[in-house]
Amino acid sequence: ETEIELTINKHKYLAFIIEDIVKVQANYNVAEAYRSAQKEAVLRAIDSDLAGLHASAGTNVAGGATVDDADMLAVVLALDLANVPQSERYGIVGAKVMGDLRAVNRYSVFDQTGKEGLAVSGKGLVTTAYGFELDMSNNVVDDTTNTHNLFFHKSAMSLALQLKPTYKMEDSVDYIGVKSVLHTIYGVAVERSAALVDLERNS
C-alpha cells in the first residue's frame, strides 16, 4: 500500500472573556451562548480546511453556470472508472449547486422519484442522488471564478485529531471575569485522490 503522510499543523481556537458584570446582569446563560459560538467557529474551521483539499482532487468536472444531471453522471463515472466502491459515497455542495439540483425533476418531484416532492415535503434539500449522500455547506471554496463542490468516497480524505476540541476556563482577576477557550489541533490530507471529484460551478 502507498504510504500517506499527514502533517498535523493546524491549531484552531476561539477565546473570549465573560466579565462578571455581564454574567451577573444577564437574564440568560451567557457562557452557554458563547460556547455555541465557539463550537460553530471551530467546526467551521475544520470544515473549511477539508473543503480546501479540492485542489488535490483526482478529477475535475466543469459544471458551468448551472449544474445538471449530466454533470452528476460525469461525477459518478469518474469514481466508477477509478474502481471506487459504490457504498459510502458523499457529496458536499454549496447553496448554488443545491439550488441547481432542486431544479432537476429527476431528484425532486413525485412522478420521477416516487416520493413526496421537495416543494411540498417540508424538506428543502436533495439528500441523495446516484448513491451519494448529499449535504450542503457554504464552506465549499469559492475562488470568485468557481465554487468547488466535493464528491468522494470516505477513503478519499483523512482528518487526524491530535487534540480533540477541548474547553479551558479560568477566573481572571485582571479582567474581573472568566476566560474561556475552545481549541483543537489537527491535520487534513487527501489519502486517495482518485476517490475525490471536484465539481466546479461558476461563482
Question: Where are the language model's segments positioned?
Answer:
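Short amphipathic alpha-helical segments, especially helix-boundary/capping motifs
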Residues: 11-15, 51-53, 153-154
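Residues at beta-strand starts and edge strands
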Residues: 12, 32, 87, 174-178
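Alpha-helical scaffold segments that mediate packing/assembly in large oligomeric complexes
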Residues: 18-86, 198-203
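A short glycine/small-residue-enriched secondary-structure motif
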Residues: 5-21
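Sequence/fold signature of self-assembling virion shell proteins
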Residues: 1-9, 25, 104-203
